[in-house]
Amino acid sequence: MNPYRQIPRFAFVAAAVASTVALHSQQTGNGPASAPAAKTLTAADCTAAKLGSEIPIKAIGEPVSAVTLSAPQWHAETANAPGYCGIEGSMAPVDKGGTARPIRFGVALPATWLRRGAQLGGGGMNGSIPMLAGGVGRGQPSLLSQGFATYGSDSGHQMSFGMPGRGMGMPGAPGLAAANPAADQWALNDEAIANLGYMQLKKTHDAAMVLLQRVYGDLPRYNYFFGSSQGGREALTVAQRYPEDYDGIAAEVPILSFSTLMLAPELIRIQEKPLANWVTPAKVNAIRGEFMRQCDKLDGLTDGVINNYMACRAIFDRKQGDPNRNPWIARRCPNNVDPNPQDTSSSACLTDGQIATLEMVYSPYVFASPLANGVRSFGMWVPNTDPSGSGLIANVRYRGQEGAADNAPVHGHLGVLGVTGFLFRDLTANPLDYVEGGALNKRRMELSAILDSTNPDLSAFQKRGGKLIVVIGTNDTLASPGAQLAYYQSVLDELERAAVDSFARFFVLPQTGHGLSGTTYNTDGDGKSITVRPIPNVYERLSLITDWVENGRAPGKSVAVTAGERSMPMCSYPEYPKYSGGPAGSASSYTCAAQ
């Protein structure tokens, strides 16, 4: 039996790892604590003699066959970062006869260490070591300059933004780049998939702890995880699988239902196999105009911003409310005939087939069988002002769709290797051949158990004193806001509100995208042209989590975010910023309200 086929977590934890956990878990973050004494190192300490050339495999809490270290390198102080010792290493896979790759990891050891550790998550499909000398917020200083030792890995494969070869087909592109079978073979290996899913996180953490002990003679008093997108999924993964290893976790825009997120663009193209169901780019203005018409004023202010995301989702989610209602009726083509398919105006009409596709995109997708953690559906997307973003609307017909040319491209997107490689186990497969509940159903369940960060039971992390902050944006077209909102709700259902509020904050930034940035729409819900302004989105990501962990100062249920002189409250799910009167650009003019 292949041990990586479906294994939620290895039971084995070496004695060295157990002692590491105990040491850096003594401070639980339940109240103020004295500042840890600084530890220092110099270039003279940054040597192979001190750091070694290998790490014993018994110190790593998930299976590896060897851990080797490269020669450390001293980096002199710059304007952006202090002097630090950088070291990289490689963890050899257990499956030596297959296509598993080594995990390449890095650790940055600052000249002045305040016994803070920070594991940094990846992005895309991973494939490179994160930038360890940077910060974790917009315009924030280096973590190294704030006394953190940082570490991260490429997750067990080597790529450029996670996608060479077949994976380079980006959303909205005509198709896939030329296949590169040698580069993509890792996607056929279950150990490599398990490394991407979760094992590399534990392996990298444990290796970093060994190196910190060697160079400083101590371990972190406070250990953190910071990640966005794929890194956000990884942040939630460690909260769910390795809660004893971290004191504070900050995640942004997590792709938590990862196995289905990679499949979701294909599900839309499958829905559009009949030519009549194809939503063309010409319809973009009509779609977002209808969202704005029905939802802009739901927050009490007609200003080109859909703040009341829950009420808006309820309107366009056909699985809520009266199944016979049609939220698109105002845009339906008379007699189901489009008199001008090239009309790009906000008054363009939609055929019944196009409406059916939009209903599919903006309602949860129900699975044939429950996936990991009993998840029965994927939340898809919520109404937004970028309905064509990330290839949600395609401008060509793909192989397998009605009306496509014989030489039409195979559909591709950022996560397509997760479909052709992980799921089909055939890099030449056409992803549009997928059938829900068909021959690949068992494999879907296996991959979900490895890749999805959807376990709502965070009680182990709560009980050890851990603190968690998650932020999502409702205009995100790369991640799935619908899936993120469903996860928020599942945690509340599992633990109840009071318990969740004691250790976690689940924030939502309406009308912001995958980078948590966004703007007002140029036409408000009354059809009036308005000035486009940035959505306030700047907040103190680092201090929010460190203050909570190290000083016991919990963030409020709402946090002010800014954009220049403008400000808004960032509210906790399921609340939204409701206009209560006063200057529209001031946070004091809003209250966080539920439905």
Segments and roles (model prediction):
Residues 241-244, 248-285, 308-310, 392-393, ...:
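Hydrolase active-site cap/lid region
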Residues 218-229:
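Alpha/beta-hydrolase fold nucleophile elbow
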Residues 232-243:
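Short glycine-enriched nucleophile-adjacent loop
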Residues 124-217, 263-264, 428-450, 512-531:
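Cap/lid segment of the alpha/beta-hydrolase catalytic domain
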Residues 26-116, 129-138, 302-306, 315-425, ...:
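Catalytic-loop region of hydrolases
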Residues 478-482:
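Conserved alpha/beta-hydrolase "acid-adjacent" motif
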